[in-house]
Every structure is written in structure tokens, then in C-alpha cells.
């Protein structure tokens, strides 16, 4: 299973430009709404310096990074939850992702139309978030009615679901996102199958330019994100798209000339990884070094299954080397000599950076 991050926002805010930047592809970028009708899916590698360091020691035939799927979802409009602008289809696409990258236009440009004829980032956010809230409200209300019709109403879990959903419904009724509702772990598990849109972890991508007004908009965006526990990543999407096309030498010179210290692109990828609460483990061999993305809190049996179902079915044990030990001692023999080689069972919790060799028998 790939971990999916959906790129959403109003039409003409820079979603497809961002998608092109992430994938270095050529998704159609057009100055009119609904240019992207079917979601474009891009497999984006997660840049990790550790895999480069391992590569220098082992010199394998092949190196494979962990990845995230970014999905460019067509622009939403006011009334999407009622079907406006193919809204139901697009909202359904969002429900399938694990996290959201909400692109917000924070620049003025007379050559790029705004669907509501005025650049107002805060209002734009309200439009999108309101549609997500209304969609969740509708789903929540229908699910409560469905559960109440069940003959097994005395079932404890069903009643707990109803109680939790009523709590959610009341919060949504006040036009609050569910991520701002204080739900405990059990309550979240009870309703997880519904994949509520306003519970999904979100990062706001502020598409800026070099004008001062962009930074005024950016400050306002940060205020909203802070209230709901989201993050904001500023990016000059068109500028960075030009940078992607340059050679490394040209890129360095350009960044130095315009005093660009870090690229928003890298922040988006790493933040997507963080939003999805993922960690990385490595498999290391002469043929291949591979980084694997798994949810934080995964056990060794779950990590084994990530590689292949046979690994988990016939699991015997996992041999663990810490990344820092591998980099320090550079050979398995030396690692064993220093007492840094460990064997773990099925319920060992994988730590970020673990290098694992699975022993199994099918």
C-alpha cells in the first residue's frame, strides 16, 4: 500500500504547478477551472541522506528510496458538497487519501484569473474547509441514522459509535473541523472507517511570489494553521519549477543570486512524510539497498509484511542493526564484535533508521 497525500484547493491556485514540481512531470497546467478532471498520481521519492551514506559503504547494484504518492485533485468550488463543479467526485477522491496538502494562492497576478475575481487567501480557505465540513456533516448524519436503525442497538460498540458520531455532528454543526475536536484514541478508532475529511492531517502550501503582499497573506495563513494544529509551507511554485529544469550548477548560482536558502519542494516532501506519521527502515545487501516507509509504531512482523506476505507468514526473527552503528563500524563482522547486533521477535517496535534482515521459512 502506498501512502497518499492529496493536493487540493480552489481552481487556479497552483495545484498542478506544484504537482509538476513534485513529480518533475508535465501535468496539464491551464488558466481555467477543472483543468485536472481525473486526479493525477505521482510517485515522489523521499530524499534521505542516510540511504546515500549506506550506498557509499555497500556500493549495491541498485538503490531504492521510500516514496509518497501525491495526488493532484481537481479544484473544488463553493457548493462542491452539493455536487457543484463535479464536487462529489472530487470530495470522494480526497476521502481516499491519508493526508492533505491544501494549496492557497497568496499572490496577485492579472494574467492568472481567480475563480471569484479577487485574491483573498483566508476566504479561499474558508470556502474549501466549509465544503469539507459540509461533506463530513452529511456523512456523519447519515451514518447515525443507519446505526440507529440496527436491531442490535444494545450492542455496546454500536452505541459507542453513535455517541461519538453525535459528538462529531455537534462540532461540525458549528462549522468546526473535526481535527479541533478532542477525541480520545478509542473514539478515533471507532470512526476511522468513515475517513472523515476534516480529521485528515493537513499542511497548507502558501503559493507566494516576491511581492510584500504575499508575506502579509502568509502571516494570516499561519494564524489559521496554528488554531487547527496544521502547518504552513511557503513555496514560489513557478520559480521552483524553473529551478528544477536547471543543471545543479545553474541552480546553485540562481539560488545564491536570489538568496534562496532552502527549497519549499523539499519541505513539502519531508512534511508529507511527517504528516503521515511515517518512519523509515532499511534493507541492505550487495544487490540492493532499499528504504521502506511504515507507520510509526509498527512491529517487526508488520515491517516484514511490508516487504512480502511470505516474510510475515514464515517469520522467524528479525536481525537489527542501528543505522548509526552501521555507519560507524561499516561491516557486519565489526558490528557483531562490538556487541551492536541484535535479534528481535515479532512484537519488536521498529525504530526509525533500523537496518533489518528478516529470517523466515515458508
From Swiss-Prot:
PANTHER family: OBG GTPASE FAMILY, OBG-TYPE G DOMAIN-CONTAINING PROTEIN. HAMAP family: YchF_OLA1_ATPase. The gene is ychF. It comes from Buchnera aphidicola subsp. Acyrthosiphon pisum (strain APS). Mg(2+) binds at residues 16, 36. One of its GO terms (molecular function) is ATP binding. One of its GO terms (cellular component) is cytoplasm. ATPase that binds to both the 70S ribosome and the 50S ribosomal subunit in a nucleotide-independent manner. PROSITE patterns: G_OBG, TGS. Residues 3-255 form the OBG-type G domain. Transmembrane segments: none annotated. Its cofactor is Mg(2+). Keywords: ATP-binding, Magnesium, Metal-binding, Nucleotide-binding. InterPro entries: ATPase_YchF/OLA1, Beta-grasp_dom_sf, G_OBG, GTP-bd, P-loop_NTPase, TGS, TGS-like, TGS-like_dom_sf. ATP binds at residues 12-17. Belongs to the TRAFAC class OBG-HflX-like GTPase superfamily. OBG GTPase family. YchF/OLA1 subfamily. The keyword Translocase does not apply. This is Ribosome-binding ATPase YchF. Residues 277-360 form the TGS domain. The keyword NAD does not apply.
Amino acid at each position: 500500500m502506498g501512502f497518499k497525500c492529496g493536493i487540493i484547493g480552489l481552481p487556479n491556485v497552483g495545484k498542478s504547478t506544484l504537482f509538476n514540481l513534485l513529480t518533475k512531470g508535465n501535468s496539464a497546467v491551464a488558466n481555467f477551472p477543472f483543468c485536472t478532471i481525473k486526479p493525477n498520481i505521482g510517485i515522489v521519492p523521499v530524499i534521505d541522506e542516510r540511504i546515500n551514506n549506506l550506498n557509499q559503504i555497500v556500493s549495491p547494484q541498485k538503490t531504492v528510496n521510500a516514496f509518497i504518492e501525491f495526488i493532484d485533485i481537481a479544484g473544488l468550488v463553493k457548493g462542491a458538497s452539493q455536487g457543484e463543479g463535479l464536487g462529489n467526485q472530487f470530495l470522494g477522491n480526497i476521502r481516499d487519501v491519508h493526508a492533505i496538502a491544501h494549496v492557497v494562492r497568496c499572490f496577485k497576478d492579472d494574467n492568472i484569473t481567480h475563480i471569484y475575481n479577487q485574491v483573498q487567501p483566508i476566504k479561499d480557505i474558508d470556502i474549501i474547509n466549509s465544503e469539507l465540513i459540509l461533506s463530513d456533516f452529511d456523512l456523519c448524519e447519515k451514518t447515525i441514522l443507519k446505526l440507529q436503525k440496527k436491531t442490535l442497538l444494545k450492542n455496546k460498540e454500536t452505541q459507542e459509535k453513535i455517541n461519538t458520531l453525535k459528538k462529531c455532528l455537534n462540532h461540525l454543526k458549528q462549522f468546526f473541523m473535526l481535527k479541533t475536536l478532542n477525541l480520545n484514541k478509542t473514539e478515533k478508532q471507532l470512526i476511522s472507517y468513515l475517513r472523515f475529511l476534516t480529521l485528515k492531517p493537513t499542511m497548507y502550501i502558501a503559493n507566494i511570489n516576491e511581492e510584500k503582499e504575499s508575506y502579509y497573506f502568509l502571516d494570516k495563513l499561519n494564524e489559521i494553521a496554528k488554531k487547527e494544529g496544521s502547518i504552513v509551507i511557503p513555496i514560489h511554485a513557478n520559480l521552483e519549477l524553473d529551478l528544477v529544469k536547471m543543471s545543479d550548477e545553474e541552480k546553485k548560482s540562481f539560488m545564491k543570486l536570489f538568496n534562496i536558502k532552502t527549497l519549499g519542494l523539499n519541505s513539502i516532501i519531508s512534511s508529507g512524510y511527517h504528516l503521515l506519521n511515517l518512519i523509515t527502515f532499511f534493507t541492505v545487501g550487495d544487490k540492493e539497498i532499499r528504504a521502506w516507509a511504515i507507520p510509526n509504531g509498527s512491529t517487526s512482523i508488520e515491517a516484514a509484511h511490508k516487504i512480502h506476505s511470505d516474510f510475515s507468514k514464515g517469520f522467524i526473527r528479525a536481525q537489527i542493526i542501528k543505522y548509526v552503528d552501521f555507519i560507524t563500524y561499516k561491516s557486519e563482522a565489526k558490528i557483531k564484535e562490538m556487541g551492536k547486533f541484535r535479534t528481535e521477535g515479532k512484537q519488536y517496535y521498529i525504530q526509525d533508521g533500523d537496518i533489518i534482515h528478516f529470517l523466515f521459512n515458508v
